[in-house]
């Protein structure tokens, strides 16, 4: 079998006004680097597929509170992750069995978080049963994780699908999820934030049922879901003058509804697509946490999106996107974006207009999103 080598490197330098401190601190600055080197192959027979891979990932993040005077406050984090993984798929008369294992070692060197390391191992096993001549599929599975600083945890899951007709499928799933605290949650301290080395891992039990319809031209997915979480990690403070402290919230229940539709049609010989999406989310985090919370202030209650992807000329495509969002605390915003793509053989040119009507809004944390902007791009295909 051939051996594949993948490598990548990216670097970004940007102003970080409002990312971590008050937006009034206008000289914040950040630089990030990300590197990846991996070697993989595929070993395959009639019924068995094995995909082994070894990899190394490196990340570097430098933050400066005052760009021209780093001595006032500066963070530098360097992470390295070395690992090996194998994914196996076996097809038999009773269905498809999937198995995977990933073992890695992570090192972090930081002037704020300290020098730390942990060993991680992830293992999963699942089997997909096809029943009733393929109209019913059942996939039970289990995942086991090990972290040297949080030990072993196992979380099972179950997916069930029922094919009502060629166009309609009903599905349901349930499972347990688990997330350990990040190094930032545990150890990060600055002028507005205090980490907590005594945090417990988050745990949640999630359930979802839904329906999928596909007629070729028209597709839609409808789903309702419920998630009961315990030990949810949030940064909270009793008042606006205090620091945020990483804290485990006792329990949070999240319920919601999701609808996505696509309609495809032709004008002359060109494809056109109209898409709509709506998400409703309701949780009781504000009832659980009476203090000021980074998480609850950013919870979206309603989100509506629409997109029109069109083509009227051979080499020109265009998109128009609209998004409306409303948060649990009542604030809302509307954003319009548009783009044009011109394809000429192996070269593509793009022009993208973001936030056309210059809406002032925040998507995460307290970081104001950019005002109206125009981006130009070019892609060359070998």
Give the predicted meaning of each segment:
Residues 3-7, 50-54, 95-101, 136-140, ...:
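Transmembrane beta-strands of outer-membrane beta-barrel proteins
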Residues 1, 39-43, 84-90, 123-129, ...:
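Residues on the lipid-exposed face of transmembrane beta-strands in outer-membrane beta-barrel proteins
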Residues 1-81:
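Flexible loop and strand-edge segments within Gram-negative outer membrane beta-barrel domains
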């Amino acid at each position: 079998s051939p051996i594949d080598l993948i490598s990548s490197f990216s670097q970004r330098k940007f102003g970080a006004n409002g990312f971590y401190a008050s937006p009034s601190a206008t000289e914040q600055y950040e630089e990030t680097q990300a590197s990846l080197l991996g070697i993989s192959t595929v070993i395959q027979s009639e019924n068995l597929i094995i995909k082994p891979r070894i990899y190394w990932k490196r990340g570097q993040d430098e933050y400066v509170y005052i760009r021209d005077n780093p001595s006032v406050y500066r963070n530098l984090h360097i992470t390295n992750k070395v690992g090996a993984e194998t994914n196996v798929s076996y097809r038999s008369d009773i269905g498809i069995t999937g198995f995977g294992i990933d073992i890695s070692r992570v090192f972090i060197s930081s002037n704020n978080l300290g020098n730390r390391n942990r060993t991680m191992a992830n293992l999963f096993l699942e089997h997909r049963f096809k029943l009733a001549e393929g109209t019913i599929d059942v996939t039970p599975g289990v995942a086991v994780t090990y972290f040297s600083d949080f030990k072993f945890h196992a979380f099972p899951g179950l997916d069930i699908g029922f094919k009502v007709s060629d166009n309609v499928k009903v599905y349901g799933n349930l499972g347990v999820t688990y997330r350990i605290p990040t190094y930032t949650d545990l150890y990060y301290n600055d002028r507005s934030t205090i980490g907590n080395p005594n945090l417990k891992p988050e745990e949640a039990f999630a359930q979802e049922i839904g329906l999928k319809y596909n007629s070729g031209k028209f597709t839609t997915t409808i789903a309702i879901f419920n998630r009961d979480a315990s030990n949810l990690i949030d940064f909270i403070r009793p008042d606006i003058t205090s620091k945020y402290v990483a804290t485990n919230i006792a329990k949070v229940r999240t319920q919601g509804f999701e609808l996505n539709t696509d309609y495809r049609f032709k004008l002359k010989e060109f494809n056109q697509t109209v898409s709509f999406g709506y998400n409703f989310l309701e949780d009781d985090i504000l009832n659980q946490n009476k203090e000021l919370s980074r998480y609850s202030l950013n919870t979206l209650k309603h989100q509506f999106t629409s997109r029109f992807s069109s083509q009227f000329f051979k080499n020109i495509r265009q998109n128009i996107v609209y998004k409306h969002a409303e948060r649990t605390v009542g604030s809302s915003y509307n954003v319009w974006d548009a783009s044009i793509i011109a394809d000429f053989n192996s070269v593509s040119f793009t022009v993208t207009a973001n936030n056309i009507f210059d809406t002032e809004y925040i998507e995460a944390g307290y970081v104001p999103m950019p005002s109206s902007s125009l981006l130009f791009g070019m892609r060359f295909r070998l």
